[in-house]
Amino acid sequence: MDQNCTPLHDLCIAAGGRMVSFAGWEMPVQFSGLMAEHKAVRSDSGMFDISHMGVLRIEGANPKDALQQLVPSDLHRIGPGQACYSVLLNEQGGIIDDLIIYDLGPSLLDESHETLLVVINAACAETDTAWIRQHLERADLQVLDEKKDGVLLALQGPKAIGLLERLSGSDLSELPRFGHCSLNIHGLQAPVFTARTGYTGEDGVELLLKADDGRQLWQLLLEEGVTPCGLGARDTLRLEAAMHLYGQDMDAATTPFEAGLGWLVHLEMPALFIGRQALEQAAEQGPSKRLVGLKLQGRSIARHDYPVIHNGATVGVVTSGSWSPTLQEPIALASLPPALAKLGTELSVEIRGQLQPATVVKRPFYRRS
């Protein structure tokens, strides 16, 4: 089957990227090596081609009120220049996908209209887009594919902001986490949508720009010594930060309460949204499972769907697992009954027929100082 390629595909290969198939795209899994890339983001700066992600522009009359029908988070908490993380839900309160919603403020063409930018996961982009269009598109509201021939680039790490300030001549000290702005970067033709967001547990930005500018910025960042990073390091970085991966740590059969995302559910707001009734019942009854952090003894790595054992019985499953390059030990996220989700609970994970001791620990495993 033919794979989609991002506008940075050839540049990734030229930079040493080892390409793999991911969610219908040919993407770099690593460049210099997972460990080196992971360390670069934790100590300096790294960049990721994330142009496979879906990007939608919702523009028209009262887009927040319209999108509010689909998410449990109060969208009126954010204003122009701000963003929030949330989830799309089905009628059962299960998670269809997670997403970031950016408020771009009044439309440039019609000040009576407003604009939202929505970033969705690559694997869910087609179904998410159809779902959102089904419920939102009307005469005075459009849902547009914003990413066509565009580049989405993540620049992450403790030195990322300083580098971007130097390349743009701008002071970003007042740009808060989940804030966004339009930035002029030296040598690029058009202003760059710049959001202080990321999927690594480090400070940094995600940049949306036209293909030609994206290619130029990639080369510029390489010349500045920024480490190109692949999907492998992106996964170990997000796992250390206990950030969810859709399809592993949550899915359409998992509610936000079961995924440890109850803080996204604002039942105190009056707005009706798909799945609200199911979540009201779930909030009253309490979740039947919880997402927890595990640290394992030894060096064996727990992978997705490995059984979690307690007193000889299977009590849950690992949702994500890896070796932690920062902590130098195996870590995992797992779904367990609430009674076993308490910190310090000792369990085992079955790895290739052997039981490996594990302990429930606090999430995230890593938090930047």
From Swiss-Prot:
Keywords: Aminotransferase, Transferase. One of its GO terms (molecular function) is transaminase activity. It comes from the Bacteria. The keyword Glycoprotein does not apply. Its EC number is 2.1.2.10. One of its GO terms (biological process) is glycine decarboxylation via glycine cleavage system. GO terms for cellular component: cytosol; glycine cleavage complex. It catalyses: N(6)-[(R)-S(8)-aminomethyldihydrolipoyl]-L-lysyl-[protein] + (6S)-5,6,7,8-tetrahydrofolate = N(6)-[(R)-dihydrolipoyl]-L-lysyl-[protein] + (6R)-5,10-methylene-5,6,7,8-tetrahydrofolate + NH4(+). Belongs to the GcvT family. The glycine cleavage system catalyzes the degradation of glycine. HAMAP family: GcvT. The glycine cleavage system is composed of four proteins: P, T, L and H. This is Aminomethyltransferase. The lineage of its organism: Bacteria, Bacillati, Cyanobacteriota, Cyanophyceae, Synechococcales.
